[in-house]
C-alpha cells in the first residue's frame, strides 16, 4: 500500500516519488550505464534524514493531522498484530450493536483479557458502517456490558481510544447519550480488575472518556486528547475553523503536555514517520507497554485498584 503524505510531509513525498521513479526505471532496463542502486540508496538515506528533521519539530496541529491519518492503525489492527484468539462480542442487549465500538475476549501473551476500542473505517462504506468512529449510546452500553463481564471473570480490561467524539445525532440524544457516557465513567471507576487505556489516535471529549477511566492511561506519541476538536474550539473562540492550528497549540492536546499535567502515565514512541509507517513495530511497542502496565497492576488488591483510581480522578485539576 502506497503511503499518503500530509501537507507538511510534501518534501518527503517528492523524494519518495523520485525513488519510485528510479526504481521503476531500474526494473525496466537493467543494462543502463549509470548505477541506479547507488542513487536510490543515497535518496533513501536523504529521505530518512529529512523525515527525522521534520518530525523532530512537529506542532500540535501537525500531530492532530497525524492522529487522524487515514492509514493509521485502528483498534482491530492492533488486535490482529498484538493479540491472539480474539473473539468479538456484539450488542448492548437493549437496542443494537454499534459498529463504532468493537470488543471481545483475546489473549495477550497467553493471558485472557477483555479488549474494547473505537473503530473507524478506511473506505467510504466502512466509514459509514463504523459511523466514522463516533459511538451512539448502544456502543457505550455494549462497552459497559463487556467491562462487567470482564470483572465477573477476573479479566483485565484493555481499551483503545480513537474517536472524534460521541455521535451528536438526534437519535443518539433521544436514546440517552449523556447518560450512557456518565454511567460508564461511574462504573469504570468502580471496576475491581485492572484497566489499561491507550489513546491510539484521536481522543475526542466525552466520547473518549467513556472508555478512558483506567488505572493506567497511555498515549501514542502522535495521538491527541482533548475536550473538543481544534476546529470546534476555533469556531467558538475565533468564529472560524481556519484558526484550528492556533487552537491546537493553545489547547495542549498532545502527549507531552498531558503527561506534564499528570493526565496520562506513559507516552509510547512511534516509528519514524508515525505508526502507519510500520504498524508491526508500533504494535510490538504497544504490546510491551501493556504487559508492563499489567505487571505493575497485578500486585494490587481489588481495594487498592479502586482507591488508586479514585485518588487519580480526584487529583485532576490540581497543580
UniProtKB/Swiss-Prot annotation:
Pfam families: ACCA. It is found in: Cytoplasm. Component of the acetyl coenzyme A carboxylase (ACC) complex. First, biotin carboxylase catalyzes the carboxylation of biotin on its carrier protein (BCCP) and then the CO(2) group is transferred by the carboxyltransferase to acetyl-CoA to form malonyl-CoA. Pathway: Lipid metabolism; malonyl-CoA biosynthesis; malonyl-CoA from acetyl-CoA: step 1/1. HAMAP family: AcetylCoA_CT_alpha. One of its GO terms (biological process) is fatty acid biosynthetic process. InterPro entries: Acetyl_CoA_COase_a_su (IPR001095), ClpP/crotonase-like_dom_sf (IPR029045), COA_CT_C (IPR011763). The lineage of its organism: Bacteria, Pseudomonadati, Pseudomonadota, Gammaproteobacteria, Enterobacterales. Keywords: ATP-binding, Cytoplasm, Fatty acid biosynthesis, Fatty acid metabolism, Lipid biosynthesis, Lipid metabolism, Nucleotide-binding, Transferase. This is Acetyl-coenzyme A carboxylase carboxyl transferase subunit alpha. Residues 35-296 form the CoA carboxyltransferase C-terminal domain. It comes from the Bacteria. Belongs to the AccA family. NCBIfam families: accA (TIGR00513), AccA_sub (NF041504), PRK05724.1 (NF004344).
Amino acid at each position: 500500500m502506497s503511503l499518503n503524505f500530509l501537507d507538511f510531509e510534501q518534501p518527503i513525498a517528492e523524494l519518495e516519488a523520485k525513488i519510485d521513479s528510479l526504481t521503476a526505471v531500474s526494473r525496466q532496463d537493467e543494462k543502463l550505464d549509470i548505477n541506479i542502486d547507488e542513487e536510490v540508496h543515497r535518496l533513501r538515506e536523504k529521505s530518512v534524514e529529512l523525515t527525522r528533521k521534520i518530525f523532530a519539530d512537529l506542532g500540535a496541529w501537525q500531530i492532530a493531522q497525524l492522529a487522524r491519518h487515514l492509514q493509521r492503525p485502528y483498534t482491530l489492527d492492533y488486535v490482529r498484530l498484538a493479540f491472539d484468539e480474539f473473539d468479538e462480542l456484539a450488542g448492548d442487549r437493549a437496542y443494537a450493536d454499534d459498529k463504532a465500538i468493537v470488543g471481545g475476549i483475546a489473549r495477550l501473551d497467553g493471558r485472557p483479557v477483555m479488549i474494547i476500542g473505537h473503530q473507524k473505517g478506511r473506505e467510504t462504506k466502512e466509514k459509514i458502517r463504523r459511523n466514522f468512529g463516533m459511538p451512539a449510546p448502544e456502543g457505550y452500553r455494549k462497552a459497559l456490558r463487556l467491562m462487567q463481564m470482564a470483572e465477573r471473570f477476573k479479566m483485565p480490561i484493555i481499551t483503545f481510544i480513537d474517536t472524534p467524539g460521541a455521535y451528536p445525532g438526534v437519535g443518539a440524544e433521544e436514546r440517552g447519550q449523556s447518560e450512557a457516557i456518565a454511567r460508564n465513567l461511574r462504573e469504570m471507576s468502580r471496576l475491581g480488575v485492572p484497566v489499561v487505556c491507550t489513546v491510539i489516535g484521536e481522543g475526542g471529549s466525552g466520547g473518549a472518556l467513556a472508555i478512558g477511566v483506567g488505572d493506567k492511561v497511555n498515549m501514542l506519541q502522535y495521538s491527541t486528547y482533548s475536550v473538543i476538536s481544534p476546529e470546534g474550539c476555533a469556531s467558538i473562540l475565533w468564529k472560524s475553523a481556519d484558526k484550528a492550528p492556533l487552537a491546537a497549540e493553545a489547547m495542549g492536546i498532545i502527549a507531552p503536555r498531558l503527561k506534564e499535567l499528570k493526565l496520562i502515565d506513559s507516552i509510547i514512541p512511534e516509528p519514524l514517520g508515525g505508526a502507519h509507517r510500520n504498524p508491526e513495530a508500533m504494535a510490538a511497542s504497544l504490546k510491551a507497554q501493556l504487559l508492563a502496565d499489567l505487571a505493575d497492576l497485578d500486585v494490587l488488591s481489588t481495594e487498592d485498584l479502586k482507591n488508586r483510581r479514585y485518588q487519580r480522578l480526584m487529583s485532576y485539576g490540581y497543580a
